[in-house]
Regions:
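RNA-contacting regions in translation and RNA-metabolism proteins
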Residues: 1-161
Length: 161
């Protein structure tokens, strides 16, 4: 299967249609908006009582929905493209919260001079934390653990010898 970086108009229409069909099957009445096309990012709007159900714990249901949309669209279009599914800007807010958390914990590490391990999180969230602190002169980050228990440890950088 060929990788497509910028989807065609038809690819976008197919993707929106697939997501709308899945939402109808889930009995969720909402609208789907295209936020960007590189990568193709769809945002689900107008969700009322089912928002928590759609997002799931730490975005797990939303990630599963995204995987399902990627698989169906890939099968229909016969090529691969990166599709991101968001709900009421949850992913955007989560990213901002993770950056803020990384900065707060880095300050605690500086104050208490001890490493702090964050909660277990999926790879894309750990990456956000690593990137948020990458330019820090005195802080380092490291992912530890296995599988779903993988977490980021934030520490003071060791002085060069």
């Amino acid at each position: 299967m060929q990788e497509v970086t910028v989807p065609s108009r038809e690819d976008v229409e197919i993707t929106v249609d697939v997501l709308q069909h899945i939402l109808r099957y889930m009995n969720i009445h909402a609208t789907v908006q295209v936020r960007s096309t590189n990568p193709l990012t769809l945002n689900i709007h107008g969700i009322n009582e089912n928002l928590g159900l759609l997002i799931g714990r730490r975005g797990e249901t939303l990630s599963s929905l995204q995987l399902l949309v990627n698989l169906i669209v890939g099968h229909r279009t016969r090529h691969r493209m990166r599709i991101i599914v968001d709900a009421e800007n949850y992913r955007q807010r989560r990213e901002e919260n993770l950056r803020s958390l990384a900065q707060r914990v880095a300050q605690q590490v500086r104050n208490y001079r001890r490493s702090i391990a964050l909660e277990a999180m999926p790879p894309h969230e750990r990456r956000i934390v690593h990137i948020a602190l990458a330019d820090s002169k005195d802080i380092s980050t490291e992912s530890i653990g296995e599988g779903d228990a993988r977490r980021v440890v934030i520490s003071l950088k060791r002085p060069a010898r």
